[in-house]
Swiss-Prot record:
Belongs to the universal ribosomal protein uL6 family. SUPFAM superfamilies: Ribosomal protein L6. Signal peptide: none annotated. The lineage of its organism: Bacteria, Pseudomonadati, Campylobacterota, Epsilonproteobacteria, Campylobacterales. GO terms for biological process: cytoplasmic translation. The gene is rplF. GO terms for cellular component: cytosolic large ribosomal subunit. This protein binds to the 23S rRNA, and is important in its secondary structure. It is located near the subunit interface in the base of the L7/L12 stalk, and near the tRNA binding site of the peptidyltransferase center. This is Large ribosomal subunit protein uL6. Pfam families: Ribosomal_L6 (PF00347). Keywords: Ribonucleoprotein, Ribosomal protein, RNA-binding, rRNA-binding. GO terms for molecular function: rRNA binding; structural constituent of ribosome. Part of the 50S ribosomal subunit. The keyword rRNA-binding applies. It comes from the Bacteria.
Length: 178
């Protein structure tokens, strides 16, 4: 059984947290996030420490307990340090450029791919490396997955968009007939 819910979340001085009923509000100097929790989870905020308790002893309450503990921890981590994902673009003629609120990708199609950068996401492009930064872990991961989906890496030459820590399992090409 997982014990994620038992963790006490330390809230750093750069992040302010408050509880309003079943709603958790987090903010720092730039952004604010709110988390609507289920009524099967009791929230306690004391001395910059956030903890959750399941209201019932059933499996559903314990599931919510761990889920909301992890979500709150991700928000606190995002507001204090942030999250980032790095993508690499590999291939002949594949290029990446940052436009005005768009990411311009040349990925071998007959047209350039223009990806609008969502609010709360910051992108840095160096050569053929895209770094996606933000305070919302889900949004950073979603944006990275959407950009990767335009041209996923192929197993023969490794061309495409891949995560920097992703390992592409290569296949051998066809062999010549004898």
């Amino acid at each position: 059984m997982s014990r994620i819910g038992k963790r006490i979340i330390e809230i750093p001085s750069s992040v302010q947290a408050s509880v309003e009923g079943s709603k958790l509000l987090f903010k720092n100097s730039k952004e604010k996030h709110e988390l609507e929790t289920h009524n099967r989870v009791k929230i306690t905020l004391e001395n910059n420490q956030l903890s959750f308790q399941p209201v019932g002893e059933d499996a559903q309450s314990r599931a919510y307990w761990g889920t909301y503990g992890a979500l709150a921890n991700n928000i606190v981590t995002g507001l204090s340090t942030g999250f980032s994902k790095t993508l690499e673009v590999n291939g002949v003629g594949y290029k990446v450029a940052l436009g005005n609120k768009t990411l311009d990708l040349s990925l071998g199609f007959s047209h350039p791919v223009k990806y609008p950068i969502p609010a709360g996401i910051e992108m840095v492009v160096e050569k053929n490396t895209i770094t996606i930064k933000g305070s919302d872990k889900q949004k950073v991961g979603q944006v990275a997955a959407e950009i990767r989906s335009f041209r996923p890496p192929e197993p023969y030459k490794g061309k495409g968009v891949k995560y920097s820590d992703e390992v592409i399992i290569r296949k051998a090409g066809k062999t010549a007939k004898k």
